[in-house]
Amino acid sequence: MDKLFVAAIKEETVGLDYFKHIGVGKINAAYNTLKLIQIYKPKIIVNYGTAGAINTKLKGIVECTKFYQRDMDVRGLDFKLGETPFDKAKEIIISDSGYSCGTGDSFVNQKIEMEVDVVDMEAYAIAKVCMLENIEFKCFKYISDNADENANNDWNTNLALGAEAFAKMINKNFNFND
């Protein structure tokens, strides 16, 4: 298998049967992505999922190419917000042309300290596994909400719309015959 498509939950990929589901949160995403790599040995992993927009100008599907751990906070020991102590990877930047994604193990429904374009719960973990395993990584997020007090309701309302939009985008950009 050259391409492996992963998403956190089935509800994000209704009608997209080629997706493997890796669970919610960084630990589930990292562990299950690594298991899938061992089974399928892909050359590229494509992650799709929903995200909250910190940059409220964003709508629809965006490509994320910069990844940060928004809930890694060891500032009390003089590390920066998002920096994992003694880890060489301070952030993961695939390209400067896309948007930044702050990944953490919480659903964001209020302002956060980290300056990123979108927030999710899996992308950094998948990007890190891909980096460590030397696998190309692509990440697309559907803006389901604005990571504010309405985020919970907006996410539920927009979940199915994201799968439809992604299906259209993916069919134009990826060849399923190779």
Locate each region found by the language model:
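Structural motif
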Residues: V6-K10
